[in-house]
Amino acid sequence: MTEVQAMVEFSVELNKFYNVDLFQRGFYQIRASMKIPARIPHRVEASLLHATGMTLAFPASVHDALVCSKTFQILYKNEEVVLNDVMIFKVKMLLDERKIEETLEEISFLLSLGLHFTDGDYSADDLNALQLISSRTLKLHYSICRGLHHHANVMFDYFHLSVVSVTVHASLVALHQPLISFPRPVKTTWLNRNAPAQSKDSAIPTLESVVFGINYTKQLSPDGCSFLIAESFLHHAYHFHYTLCATLLLAFKGLHSYFITVTEEIPSCQKLDLEEMDVEARLTELCEEVKKVENPDELAELINMNLAQLCSLLMALWGQFLEAITLHEDLRVLLAQEHHTLRVRRFSEAFFCFEHPREAAIAYQELHAQSHLQMCTAIKNTSFCSSLPPLPIECSELDGDLNSLPIIFEDRYLDSVIEDLDAPWMGIQSLQISEASKTDKHETEESSVVGLSSPELKVRPAVASSNCYTEGEKQLTKSLKGKNEESNKSKVKVTKLMKTMKPENTKKLIKQNSKDSVVLVSYKCLKTTASSDFTKCLEGSPSHSQKEGLDPTLCAGNFDPKTYTRQPSQKEASSLSANTDRSEHKSPDTENMQPDQFELLNSGSLNLCANLSISGKLAISQDNSDIPDTEHNLASTSSSNDCHDYQTTPSSGVRTLEVKSSSKESFNGEKITVKIGPWTELQEAELFVDNLLPDFEALDSNDKPKSIDIPLERDALQETKCHSTEESLTKFRSNLPAPSTKEYHVAVSSDTIKLPDTNATYASSRFSDSGVESEPSSFATHPNPEIAFETLQGPGPCNNERLFPQLLMKPDHNVKFSLGSHCTESTSALSEIQSSLTSINSLPSDDELSPDDNCKKSAVPDCHLSDSKTVFNLGTMDLPKCDDTKKSSIILQQQSVVFSGHLDNDTLAMHSLDLSTEDPLRLVFLDEDASSGVRSSWGSKPHLDAPFTGPQSQGTSSNNSTESVPTLNSKLICLGSPCVVSGSVCTDAGLSADRTVEGKSGEPLNHKQVCSAAPVVESDPLSSSTDVVKQGLVENYFGSQSTTDVSDACAITCHSPVSSQETCDKGISDLQQEQGKEEEEEDQEMVQNGYHEETDFSATDGTVSVHYISGNELGEGRHEQSEKLSSNYLSAGVTVPAVCTSGCLSFPSALRESPCVKYSSRSKVDAITKQPSSISYNFSSSTSWYENSPKPQIHAFLQAKEELKQLRLPGFMYSDVPLLASSAPYFSMDEEDGSEDGVHLIVCVHGLDGNSADLRLVKTYIELGLPGGRVDFLMSERNQNDTFADFDCMTDRLLDEIIQYIQIYSLTVSKISFIGHSLGNLIIRSVLTRPRFKYYLSKLHTFLSLSGPHLGTLYNSSALVNTGLWFMQKWKKSGSLLQLTCRDHSDPRQTFLYKLSNKAGLHYFKNVVLVGSLQDRYVPYHSARIEMCKTALKDKQSGQIYSEMIHNLLRPVLQSKGCNLVRYNVINALPNTADSLIGRAAHIAVLDSEIFLEKFFLVAALKYFQ
């Protein structure tokens, strides 16, 4: 091994020292030293660049490798001292010449900064006169290409709150033969293991041994006149020369380019004099010169000379760089902003946000808390936390690491959110889904686009949906498992996780599965839903509305446009506005919808065929593309009333649809046998979404099934045509009560497939993402999480499934499905069913809506449905909900299979969309909605009109005629085809167009295309569709887009909302145009990324091969695209987002808000970013904060994000949000003295047995995070000597303290905020009720409650804590502790806490922020967050009182439009100590954990104090 000497030079500038809150006056000094691992032979030389500025108390000095800053004196609070000490550290090392670059990037360069202090006499000569009081170690991550140019504020510990700002520049400056000897550590043996470390200097090698290798020896030639050089030595010399020259030139190029960039961005910076060097040409020239030399001595000298010349050039450039930029204020400001942005972005990882309807705040939500713990466990079981890339300058004590970063969950309660898509998460089913999608993926890859081929799935007779899994589901689960095992390890992990879940949670998990394809606990959050419904959902039991079938009244309420509209409030108000428009468009649909339809929708419309089980594989032939066989397992509820309980269908009602497809030819020329058992009666309304489509022609409302022939343009659909007999749909809709099983033989041609009328029902069945049509009930109702999950999984887990079921379902079912998908989590059976749908389509609505109501709302508002012919405007539909699913965001593509009920989502989409086939896909829709009796002309115009009024002008104008569809690109067509598949429902092509707007071809989709696309996709037959499909539009249409990219899915789902919301900046047409292009990319990405989850969703790279490409072209194109994406995932923002977003970042909320997002923005914006932000602007920083990390770290992190995506976690992560709470670096602005607005007074109140310094860190991080703001803190100390008194006494003290503080300092108060810890929160609330404080009520701004026992300690689960508090109460005779237990009066309604809850207070605040932790056993979690707990529900005595207190506290808050309620759950990374065990560590972590507080405030909470 040949070693070379390298020198890396570091310039360390100590800019300023800030006294944040030092306790002692005296002399302070910063000492800096550089260390690298002892295993690398090295020497460190330190020096001061030049003395600048005042010497202060004493000047800076150098002591060997230690540099001491100026010594300065601190006398005053908030004092700033300008140091401007520039230290130069030259690190000389011996490196292996074969691994120079790798070694330099892996070395840990450790910069140690120590704070030294003395309050006595000080002599500069005596280093020991100053004592070390605090220190920080910075790990500098150096790169040869980029060097290191960074700025950081280094804060010392809690007891010495001070900050020193440090700027670091580093570059390689020399690389040559070893010129000095280096100490080498002597290996220790067991004999001298206790001896002090020893080292010996290494020998200095000769130049020849370095150039030619250590084994080189001179050999004379035969003539004795020259030396011979063996070929191996000569090759070594050439390689040595090339490697070192290339490395030096690389460092030169990096430093030169950075220098140029700095001089361009900072005009005041000195310009660069050196001419630019053509690095590659120079390297080639040097190598050619060396190869011309024959004499070994001359060769070695020439190589040495070349290296010396390059080193001199590099040193000259480095010297000029330092001269120009050292202590340059503008550059320091620029670097400080960069570091702050990266740091906040890094903190935003693992910070989750969930958005709920406002009324959900009063619902029983303990399942949410439990799901938070499960999510934490699942996240920690992945490599996400351990692979989090470090910052360029890393300090684990300040920036956090695997062992210290908390995971935070935020629950928002917004008027703009109608459906609760962020339901509790149970990992099992979501894992199953991912497995299923993997399975599908493999199969689709094998056979083509269809879905996964799985064993026949048979639906077990109706069983308690929540209690049993059908055998078919089990089989599906097994098959999925097998496939999943073949899939990514991450998915396997997920599966294991799911297996560990308890069966009883299965229902909940299934229901959850809609939004993010994460299984959501059956929890509905709809304003219309009664609290009992919420509770039932939470408990996993169907709400009464579910059991009874959706109540028409409820349905209407649920479909209330406002309710339905799930505004993307998650992200931004703008997205909300877009959603609002959407809701307005949708409202007419809801009005038309019948209760039954709503029910179906709630059930997810998957249960359309009550007992339809499709086993075997279905593939719609695509001329060009192979379609993998798919098995579909469909279970439909026996009746709309039973929708919630898909499995409730009678056992005799089981129907099996067996479709055998030729592996390559799809089903060309083959026959499929459809076996239909007796159908339970289904209410016509159930099947009909048509009522939802006001614009559609009314069909006879009789029960007779009517068929609508809808040609789906091959654009999206492929040439293949699929005809589902209207009768079959109608029968399904009408719930054919056929006791006997019937067999229908259907010839499947490449062009079309017709299914008997009796099978119509099956069309409405939902399709799982995995490509398996799963019984709606089977997934949702099945207790077996694995089965349900797998069924849901499908290729495009949640997101795709959500979209797809909506499209595939009959109109009513679709509507319900879309609605139901939202509410599936809420409704137990229905929600379960919907969950399966959602898993398929990642039903966003499921997650968001309350069980039944949510389902209804989401589906209807999104699209207008006319009879069974309803066309869903995907855009109009609650795609944002799908967005919420994020991962599967749109499986619709997959689902667009021609077969109405039996095809996989993916399979359907693929087949129907076979672009290769020019023939439009023909779908026969039965009037499944006999009740509505409205025949929706597939002209999506009606439903399109509502959603796309503005931009859709083209599509809207079109009639049901297929013409309108033609304009649609393949994407649109795909949308239509899913509709076809659904049988009665067609997705609005317009929506699809909206999403795909430009289609991959880039041509804007016409609204009419969109409109007609749903039913009549045939319009532009194949040409446009083919292009679009190739472009991935088809997938987009089906939602594969969203599947691939959560943000994409969101955008798509939201698209129609966006279009309907045209409210968005652009008309739909504009959006379509922009979105079309991006959608093309997105579609491809999505497909590639796994949005088409069946095929490639499992791919860690996030790319998914599209299996539903029309013909082979589409498949090939998609695969190519996916390959490109995978290969370019690091460079492509879209791809990366897909990867990043996939798990962690796929935020349902973002998706909801996404409606405002434009598809075009998607291509520009990271998938992650798009999702979370309902904003349409691009934002790259969500993924860019780690872009300068080493590629292996970036790759590992993206892989971990993919793992996280597989978990289908609900909500979104703040890392995907473009704008975070903090944007201004610490100390970046001076306080504005002349503000006329007055000061913002923040009163901090400590807890039991606390003192005024308890909230010192909270104060610090708010002050640092709001530079320039006029903020004044009152750290309450009046009660610190006696916190055991009763609350009335402590209230009087605090009130006096506040009023006196304002008067003494003559403050002009513009805002008053309160921050309380523990007991202090009750004192604050009590102050608000006092007459003397009435004057200040109008100035109240934010109430931040940190672990406050607002409901007392009545239901504390810790016996140890209860015993301790009881003892303390008796010992101290504490009135406050007695009042906390609600035992201070014999009548519970006369206790202090109950009376306090009846008094006005909280609703006066603009923000009510409740922070709690499940790890905190001092204060019950539900008491800190003011929510119902399970124990209180069971307590017949005090439980009612507890519930009344919650309503008394929150009802005024919820009714006040100007009051924002937010709850947080903090999962701290706590060590295994006694404090952690008894729950004390978490209780005080909200006060003394720097990393938690900084993460909490920088990412989210600072906005409450701005």
Swiss-Prot record:
It holds the Pfam family DUF3657. Residues 536-596, 629-662, 935-964 are annotated as: Disordered. SUPFAM superfamilies: alpha/beta-Hydrolases. It comes from the Eukaryota. Residues 564-580, 629-654, 950-964 have a biased composition (Polar residues). Belongs to the FAM135 family. This is Protein FAM135A. It comes from Mus musculus. The lineage of its organism: Eukaryota, Metazoa, Chordata, Craniata, Vertebrata. The gene is Fam135a.
